Amino acid sequence: MGNAAAAKKGSEQESVKEFLAKAKEDFLKKWETPSQNTAQLDQFDRIKTLGTGSFGRVMLVKHKESGNHYAMKILDKQKVVKLKQIEHTLNEKRILQAVNFPFLVKLEFSFKDNSNLYMVMEYVAGGEMFSHLRRIGRFSEPHARFYAAQIVLTFEYLHSLDLIYRDLKPENLLIDQQGYIQVTDFGFAKRVKGRTWTLCGTPEYLAPEIILSKGYNKAVDWWALGVLIYEMAAGYPPFFADQPIQIYEKIVSGKVRFPSHFSSDLKDLLRNLLQVDLTKRFGNLKNGVNDIKNHKWFATTDWIAIYQRKVEAPFIPKFKGPGDTSNFDDYEEEEIRVSINEKCGKEFTEF
């Protein structure tokens, strides 16, 4: 690297530092005094279910007053309590209302009633990366790199706020109308200084230290990035088997096999991300995220242009207009029932 290039890289890293310091101030204000109860259910027309989970569903809704479409996440308080997800749910809302980044889905409103908790988010009409990846089979390396770069920047932002994301997978990455990523589902995200011990995540994406019940840190997100890049470029994850226990054995073994079409730069990056030894894993060393950003596989990536969303996306989802749900699967519809008596009031006071 010549002197000029080194100087440019140095000044870029300085301005990133400044940007993140300012971002942290903004985040902390909202983190310390979270917004509450900014809308109510009868202000929305419910249109269609976009996804379901163990304690709720996500619906496309239309805000009556503005005509805007949103994705409304509806969580049944009693089910959240039964599944011991109170802490995770409170975390999700508190984090979402405080963050602000181009590749994070925006929380527009949140409120609760006797039965449910509601998070109303920007509607991202392109659907999950998961469905596009399965349809296409696998992404070319430039295509995978475009998405990976956005995740790298997003993790750099979140980690600077002491947030661990812990749930990276193609199902949680939505593609917007410009072809960029919107990270959704902060149900496992957590503000942690130092280490944490909770077992959570998706089997294929779990870092070895989580499986081995060790205290772990932000480095689990960089491991998961390795899994995601591999899955995007191969069409299948690096560690898979029928039973979670078999997946865990493969993950902990530290052995990865690469498809023959992977470039040598990609294999090198993945060996450094899917690194069982935490003292060697990229993202967790003294240069932090810069070991990843400066890696040869990302040599063509203009990080600032990605952040500014100025790079042309490799793929734009088909979109028939506002409220189009053709990029989502169909689910059985169910009435939203609200009890006349308050359920689990105490547990969710701070929501």
Curated annotation (Swiss-Prot):
Q: Which residues carry this modification: Phosphotyrosine?
A: Y331
Any one Gene Ontology MF annotation carried by this entry is: cAMP-dependent protein kinase activity
Organism, as annotated: Mus musculus (Mouse)
| Domain spans labelled Protein kinase | 44-298
Membrane topology, as annotated: Lipid-anchor
Q: What does this protein do?
A: Phosphorylates a large number of substrates in the cytoplasm and the nucleus. Phosphorylates CDC25B, ABL1, NFKB1, CLDN3, PSMC5/RPT6, PJA2, RYR2, RORA, SOX9 and VASP. Regulates the abundance of compartmentalized pools of its regulatory subunits through phosphorylation of PJA2 which binds and ubiquitinates these subunits, leading to their subsequent proteolysis. RORA is activated by phosphorylation. Required for glucose-mediated adipogenic differentiation increase and osteogenic differentiation inhibition from osteoblasts. Involved in chondrogenesis by mediating phosphorylation of SOX9.
In the record, Deamidated asparagine modifications are located at: N3
Its keywords, alphabetically, are: ATP-binding, cAMP, Cell membrane, Cell projection, Cilium, Cytoplasm, Cytoplasmic vesicle, Flagellum, Kinase, Lipoprotein, Membrane, Mitochondrion, Myristate, Nucleotide-binding, Nucleus, Phosphoprotein, Serine/threonine-protein kinase, Transferase
GO-annotated cellular components: acrosomal vesicle; axoneme; cAMP-dependent protein kinase complex; centrosome; ciliary base; cytoplasm; cytosol; glutamatergic synapse
EC code: 2.7.11.11
Which residues participate directly in catalysis?
A: D167 (proton acceptor)
* Lipid attachment, kind N-myristoyl glycine: G2
Q: Which Gene3D superfamilies match?
A: Phosphorylase Kinase, domain 1 (3.30.200.20), Transferase(Phosphotransferase) domain 1 (1.10.510.10)
What Pfam families does this protein's entry cite? Pkinase
The reported effect of T198D is: No phosphorylation by PDPK1
Explain what the record says happens when changing W197R: Does not affect interaction with SMO
GO-annotated biological processes: adenylate cyclase-activating G protein-coupled receptor signaling pathway; adenylate cyclase-inhibiting G protein-coupled receptor signaling pathway; cAMP/PKA signal transduction; cellular response to cold; cellular response to glucagon stimulus; cellular response to glucose stimulus; cellular response to heat; cellular response to parathyroid hormone stimulus
Record domain AGC-kinase C-terminal: where: 299-351
Reactions listed under catalytic activity: L-seryl-[protein] + ATP = O-phospho-L-seryl-[protein] + ADP + H(+); L-threonyl-[protein] + ATP = O-phospho-L-threonyl-[protein] + ADP + H(+)
Please state what the protein is called: cAMP-dependent protein kinase catalytic subunit alpha
Membership in a protein family:
Belongs to the protein kinase superfamily. AGC Ser/Thr protein kinase family. cAMP subfamily.
Positions contributing to ATP binding:
50-58, 73, 122-128, 169-172
Q: Which modifications occur after translation, per UniProt?
A: Autophosphorylated; phosphorylation is enhanced by vitamin K(2). Phosphorylated on threonine and serine residues. Phosphorylation on Thr-198 is required for full activity. Phosphorylated at Tyr-331 by activated receptor tyrosine kinases EGFR and PDGFR; this increases catalytic efficiency. When myristoylated, Ser-11 is autophosphorylated probably in conjunction with deamidation of Asn-3.
